């Protein structure tokens, strides 16, 4: 009876906050993948709009702040980041890079003093398509649902998502969209865009991982999917947990114990226990996993189909794009960041590899733990509550807080629908 009484009130509050209708819900077609105890605990959060929206808003802000911080050094290695940052007195990294920082070409909009609203980023564009999927297809979307939303609204894709989008628009649907002429199946693309599935399944990591796998299956297999499952589970766990080691250890339960991704993360947990200084742990990580057996960090694909003159195959086989290596880098930043928002995203930025993706991922996890209300204003204010999107249903200038409120609305539906249908 308590659920029946509270459900309409909380839904009404969230619907008013989000400015959208909750009537698009469709019943779930699959088992809940969450225990009754997990669902009841999740319901205690999602039925408290103020507290839940703060958590979701914190995760969205953490994502966007981490991306903005690290975008100027996207795809750089630790040594190059340090060298350029030292040129302008910005090492160790403790804030946004200053306006005189020499970063990647076109990085000026992300530099402090220039940053005025969050510029578009492919990680976020694809997360927003998950939000649109929840809006248009309901809270139990299939891979085909997500793919059809991509087909309809995704303006561009990079690396694995670019190949998958090309396949989808030729009528090749998941899972074949991931396996057809796609050399990037084990890359970071799933890992970098699935935070939202953890946000809408708070404290239900198996459910979050399952939803993330549906999303990642458009463009990834194997380690690429395991990374997506791990990140979504971590965000889900972070909604109730603040200790990074606990989050990482528990998130490992939702990927195969013998997969490479799990091995990399377990190694980082071991190095963290061994070394007080993050740089020593990084040295172990980079030595063991940062290179191919021939000592190189990147190589060309042998298959003539993947000619780099073709736009969707313009990226080579670089270690820094692997889900496994970047998952380990995220784990390192989370452990040595010790739950401190600024320290965690700054460490992630100094570590490098697929730098912006990783800082965004750890920002989303810590942001979910602490909530928007605990993120220092220095980090939030340059975003001006604005994300500039190329996704038409979102709008060219979207309110970040409104995005968070709509996400929270669907999170309520995800939990309440399963609590009713799968008690």
List the predicted regions and their residue ranges:
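Bacterial N-terminal signal peptides that target proteins for export
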Residues: 1-9
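Acidic, carboxylate-rich catalytic segments that either coordinate divalent cations
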Residues: 31-38, 262, 269-319, 369-423
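Accessory "access/gating" subregions that flank catalytic or transport cores
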Residues: 43-47, 166-170, 174-185, 194-204, ...
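Mature N-terminal segment immediately following signal peptide/propeptide cleavage
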Residues: 48-70
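Catalytic phosphate/nucleotide-handling subdomain of diverse soluble enzymes
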Residues: 65, 69, 76-89, 220-223, ...
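Active-site-surrounding "flap" and adjacent substrate/cofactor-binding loops of secreted or lumenal enzymes
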Residues: 73-111, 124, 147
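Active-site cavity-forming subdomains of large catalytic enzyme subunits
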Residues: 116-221, 225-229, 240
